[in-house]
Amino acid sequence: MNQANFLQELPNVLKRLETGLIIPQLKDILRVFGLRLSGTKAELITRIKQLIERIAIENNTTSWEALKKAIDGDVTSAVCILKYNTYQIYSAAAPIAPPSSASGNRSYSRPFAPVVHSRIRFRKSPFYDILEQFNAPFVVPACVGTRNTISFSFHVTPPALSKLLNDPKQYRVYLFSTPSETIGFGNCLMEFPTPQMELRINNQVAHANYRRLKGKPGTTNPADITDLVSKYAGPPGNNVVIYYMNSTKSYSVVVCFVKVYTIENLVDQIKSRKAESKEKIIERIKNDNQDADIIATSTDISLKCPLSFSRISLPVRSVFCKHIQCFDASAFLEMNKQTPSWMCPVCASHIQFSDLIIDGFMQHILESTPSNSETITVDPEGNWKLNTFDEPVESSEDEFVPKEKVIELSDGEGISTMANKSNDQPTRRASTHNSGPPAKRKRESLVIDLTISDDDENVATSTTESPSNATKENSLSRNVQSPNIDTAISNRSTNVRHGHPGFKDYTVENSPASRERSTSESAQSSVHMGYAGEGGLLSGALRAPSQQNNNNSNTQHSINLHTIVPSPYEPPLSVTPSTAITNLSIPESNRTNSSASSKSFTMNDLILPPLHLKNTTQTNNAHEDAQSSNLSQNHSLFYERIPQRPSYRIEKQNKGIYEDENEQSISAMPIPRAHPQLPKNLLSQTAGPLWDEQQDAQVDWNSELQSNNSYHNSGFEGTGNTFQSID
C-alpha cells in the first residue's frame, strides 16, 4: 500500500467516519469486516478506528479500498472487493476462542475471515422457491431529501430461460430487495427502499406493490418482472433502473429465478399432512377444564371463517394454537398471498406454513351440521350442540312450491282472481338434513296482470268464470265507478222516472236490435256530456234499458222528459236539442217523432221590440219563424206596451256629419230653434251662445221648464212654450 496516498486519504476518511455516518451505517461497516455490532456510537467509531490501525500496520491495500467503499455507503462493492482477497485480522480486544477438545487442553488462535455475501438468503415463502440468483447484490444507497437513480444489469442463464419459455406459469423472475444491515444475520426480510419508487426493466415500467404494513417488515411481495425480461440469453442482458427518494438506509437488490406454487397446491400439501384427531382434541378440552379453581362454561364456536365470513370448508389452525376456533385454509392462504403477514386471525400469533394442521374435531362438526347453520356450543366435556336460535336460510332442498295466482286489475270489472281451481296441495320435498330445524315456508307469490284492457273484460270473464261467478262480479262492479257505461246501465232499472219539471214524456223502445246499434253511441255521448256518474241531471233518463230480464227484452219503457216553460217576465234562453237524446237507443220508427217533439220546447232568441231594421240573424231551425204566434196573452200585452222610438229624417240642405258614406239619410236629432233673446250674430257660432247674466235673469225659466210634451207611437208633437228665432 502506498503510504503517501494512505496518509493523504486518512483525514477525509476519519472526518466522514466521525461526522457523516449514523449508527446503522457504522454497523454496516463493521458487518462487512465481521466485527462486533453492539455498543454506542462512540464505541462503534472506536472499533472502526482500531480496524484502520491494523490495516495500516499490515499494509493491506485490499482492506483499505473495501473500507473506503463501505464508509462511502457502497457496502456491496466492499463485499465484492473482499470476496477474492482474504486477509487475516487478529483482534486483541475480542479474540475468538477455539472449541474445546476432549483429547487435551490444547489452545490456538484461529484467524478471522471476513463475511463475503455473494448470495442473500431470504425468508422462505410457501408461494415460491428461489432456484437461481442472476446477479450479485446491488446496493441502493440511502438518499434523504433528494431523488436518486441507480441502474444495473443482469443476464438470464440458458437453463432458466428454457424453463421460463416452456412453463411460464410455474417459473417466474422476481426482483428482491432487503436492507443491507440485515445481510449475514439469518434470513432476510423482503422490503423495498421506499414506497415512492419507480422500477423500470428495459425502459418499461414494472407495476408492483412496494408498500408494506406499517411497523411490520417483510409484509410485501417481490416484484414480478417476468413479462419485461428479454427472452434470450447473453449480452447485452437486461437493464434495471430504480428511481427513489427519502430512503433512510441502504438496500441490496437482487434478481432471482423462482418456482411458484398455487393455492391449490398448498391446500393439497396441508391435506397430505397428518390431521389432529377428534379424540385428541376432546381430551385436551377436558384437561384444560379440570382446574378446580376455574369454573368452566360452554363456549360458542362459529362455523364461519373469521377472514372470509363464509362457511369453513377446510378447518385449519397452527399446531401451537390451543383454541377450538379454526379458519379456512384457502382464505388464509389467499390473504397471505396478497400481504404476507402470517398472523393467526384468532389469537394473532405468528404462524408458519409448515405449522398448519387440519382440526379433526371441527371437521367432524362441519360434516354433521347442515350447510345453513352458523354457530355451535361446546361444553367443558367436549360435547357440542347446534344453537337453536339460528334461523336457517331457505334452500332449494327445503321449500314449498306454491302455485302462482294471477290477479287481473281492470277499470270496470274490479278485481278478479284467476287461480288454479284444482284441489292439489303443495307437497314438501324430502330433506337430506335431519339435525337442523325445519325451514320456513315461503310466501305465496301473487302475480298482478295490468295489461288487460276494458275491451277484453267480457271475453276474459266469460271464458274463465261460470254464470254464477259472473253474477257476483256484476254485483261487485256496481260499487266501482267506471267509465264503462254498459255495465252501469245493465245494472240499473229500466223504468226511470225523473221528477224534474223541465222534461217532457217520451217513449223509448227497448229492443235487442236497438241495443246493439246504440251501445257505443250511448257510451260516448254520456261520457262526453258528463253523465257517467249517477249524480248527473240526465244520468237516470239517459241510461239504456237493462239486459237482466230476457223475457221482457221486447217491451217498451217510458222515460219522462218535461218541457221547459219560460216565464213571461224573463227572457228565455235558447236551447238546442241534446245529442244524448238523439243518440239513445231509439228505433228508427220512433226517432222522427222524438225529433219533432224536441222542437216544441226549443226557445227563440231574446225578445226585442221591432226597430224596423233588417234581421241579420240567420235562422237555422224552421220552427223559430212561428214562435211569436205561440206566445201567451200576457206575453202579447207586454210586447204592445213597449214604447217605440220615433223616426226622423234630415233635410237635404243639412248634409254633413248626419249623412253616411252612401249618401242615405238616417235618423238624427231634431234641430233646436233659436232663443228669442239671443242676438243674430251669435247663431252662426258653432261653439253655442254666450251666457249673459242680465239676459238670463229676464228669462222666465219656471214657465220654460213646466212645458208638457206628449208622445205617441205614430210620431212626435210638442205643446207649450215654443222657441222663436230673432229675425
Swiss-Prot record:
It is found in: Nucleus. Changing residue 323 to A: Reduction in sumoylation of rad22. Its EC number is 2.3.2.-. Its main location: nucleus. One of its GO terms (cellular component) is chromatin. Residues 18-52 form the SAP domain. Residues 408-558, 706-727 are annotated as: Disordered. GO terms for molecular function: SUMO ligase activity; zinc ion binding. Belongs to the PIAS family. Interacts with hus5/ubc9. Acts as an E3 ligase mediating SUMO/Smt3 attachment to other proteins. Involved in the maintenance of the centromere and in telomere length. Regulates recombination, via extension sumoylation, particularly within the heterochromatin repeats. This is E3 SUMO-protein ligase pli1. It comes from Schizosaccharomyces pombe (strain 972 / ATCC 24843) (Fission yeast). The lineage of its organism: Eukaryota, Fungi, Dikarya, Ascomycota, Taphrinomycotina.
